[in-house]
Amino acid sequence: MKITQWPAHERPREKLLTQGPDALSDAELLAIFLRTGIKGLSAVDLARNLLNTFGSLRGLISASQQDFCLAKGLGEAKFVQLQASIELSQRFFAEQLQRETVFNSAQQTKHFLIAQLRDEPNEVFGMLLLDSQHQLIKFRKMFFGTIDSASVYPRVLVKQALEDNAAAVILTHNHPSGVAEPSQADEHITARIISAMSLLDIKVLDHLVVGDGVAVSFAERGLI
């Protein structure tokens, strides 16, 4: 049965308009993105098949161009459309941060960093560079590693903070496993970075570890 033949309250677009996007499942949201199905499958059925094929919404979004385009019902145009949607989301959060005092907007900071790092297939270490009022100067991805680690050099971070004239920084990195729990190695490198930054009076306000849709704050854990 075509979606247009469904009761109005069950159609994804109508449901979003009346109940808001939070009321929709991953498959329903993806169906809106797809717009149409394929022969024998509605857009919602196709969306469910794609989520099963890639394992999750995260798996679909982080798929390589080749794997994405080979999936039935997708293609290069959809890949480009998806990448543009992701980039718009990231720029939206960056613009929101630039308007707010980052240190006083912990939840907004988490949302931004999750959008930036959650779908990275390998570990990435970055930092938010802030001015004396804790307003965002720039977000930089500094080090890129393997699926379970990235080499981090405090002196390089200090040099970048000086070049950007930052008075404070918020550190961040992702765990590609999806588990955001800080490790002992994370705590050790954070202590080294704090020590290096303090020599030049640059404050490390927090270190956020990003997993699958969540971010754990060192400051909230009392680790900074």
UniProtKB/Swiss-Prot annotation:
This protein's UniProt keywords: Hydrolase, Metal-binding, Metalloprotease, Protease, Zinc
Gene3D superfamilies in the record: 5' to 3' exonuclease, C-terminal subdomain (1.10.150.20), Cytidine Deaminase, domain 2 (3.40.140.10)
Domain of life: Bacteria
Positions contributing to Zn(2+) binding: 173, 175, 186
GO terms (BP aspect): proteolysis
Residue numbers covered by motif JAMM motif: 173-186
MPN domain residues: 102-224
Molecular function terms, GO-annotated: metal ion binding; metallopeptidase activity
Name of a matching Pfam family: UPF0758_N
Homology family: Belongs to the UPF0758 family.
Name assigned to this protein: UPF0758 protein Patl_0046
Species this chain originates from: Pseudoalteromonas atlantica (strain T6c / ATCC BAA-1087)
Source taxonomy: Bacteria, Pseudomonadati, Pseudomonadota, Gammaproteobacteria, Alteromonadales
